């Protein structure tokens, strides 16, 4: 039987480099601190959750994806190498110690998506670098998306009672949930997604972004409207999606940061921006790498 090779260890750093998207099963890497745990496969699939010493959990992220839209061509592609049926001009996943970076290129647009969990804090951090490798300018949108079960799992005949809203002056969207995971008794928590600049649009309602019959690989908001729809949520299933403007000259690169986490109080929610100041996400990533040397 012929042996098939899906990747190899990097020669210059402690990473395993996966060069084939379609591995026999999801190839996971794990990121964690004392209170927040996450994992991601070679195509971005995975979860993020906070738990306490008794194992009580809040499943904040039940899946994740990053999309790059071409507003002129009215098309979109993912930064995680999905869907499998579509060819990419370049794909690579680097599983490192405490982080994963997925690089994809298609239609002259290259993305580098890095995910990690900092040494402290109830959140995971995403850093996305986009490069225009075309000879012409590109008018793009960059959308970070996370499915969640912080408002309980979806059931076809179930009912969701939570709400989710936007705080655009703080560059974030948030919801609320009751959990005993942090305090030992039911406490109102504030799950959120934030970014390091002004959002162009957002979605918090799952049916507004994915659609009733859409999927992560084909969200109805992107297929029908080309981007997020500015939906807030009242007693429906929640999701988190933030869209950023990404206009690029030929050869230009831009970096965007996103954070998905849980704030225990509204005061903590108002302080999220401190960990998204220029250079801070990169500093947190270096700290993770240094701790694992």
Segments from the language model and where they lie:
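Anionic coordination/interaction segments
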Residues: 1-293
